[in-house]
C-alpha cells in the first residue's frame, strides 16, 4: 500500500513538472510570436541617441503612483507601507498593448526591461485591450546606451549580452529573493548576462572584464552601483546617484 502511494505521488509530481514546463514553453513561444508579428507590422530603427530615447518615452502617458490602478498596487505589493514610501513620488509609463515590443535603447525593447511574471502574462494574454505599467528612470536607459556606444567605440560587440532583470515590482522582487530595497524596484537597475563581447567565439571572463571596466571607469563611475558577481557571467549596474560596489550576488 505504501509503495503504491509512493508511486502515485511520484507520477503526480512528474505530471505537475511536465505541466509547468509546458506552460513555461507556451508563454515563451507566445512572447516570441507576438514580437515577430510586431516586427512584421511596424518599422523600427535602432535607438542610438539620448534624444531618440526621450522621444519614444514622450509618446507614453506618465502616471503618478497616487493614480495607479488599485488592482495593480495590490497584485504587485506596491501598496505595502514600506514600498508606498519608496514609490510615492514615482511616475510610471503606461505601455499599451504590443508597444512592449517597441525598441527603446539600441535594439533592446521595452519588453526586455519588464519582469516575466503573472502580471506580464496577463498583459500578454490580451494585448489588444490591455495596458501595462513600467517604472524606469531614463538615466538607466542613457547609461545602457552609453555602455553600448563605448563597446562599439573600442571595437567590441555592442549587443553581446542578454538582459535578465530590469524593473521588478515588489511582489516579483520578493519572489525571486531580491534585496528588500532593491534598485530594481525603483526602475534604476539592470542585470545583464555577458556573451562574446570580444568576438573570439567564446564567452569568457575576458568578455566580462571588458564590460566591467567600461562601466566602472566611464559609464557608472561614482554615479551608481556595480555588482561584479565573480565566477558568473552576470553584471548588475544602477543609477542610484552615488558610488556602490559589491561582489556577492
PLM segments and residue spans:
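Extended, low-complexity, intrinsically disordered C-terminal regulatory tails
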Residues: 144-177
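Catalytic cores and adjacent binding grooves of peptidoglycan-active enzymes
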Residues: 24-31, 181-249
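Solvent-exposed, polar/charged alpha-helical surfaces in well-ordered, non-transmembrane soluble domains
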Residues: 142-145, 149, 209, 213
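Extracytoplasmic cell-surface/polysaccharide-interacting catalytic and binding patches
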Residues: 22-144, 241-249
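N-terminal Sec-pathway targeting helices
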Residues: 1-16
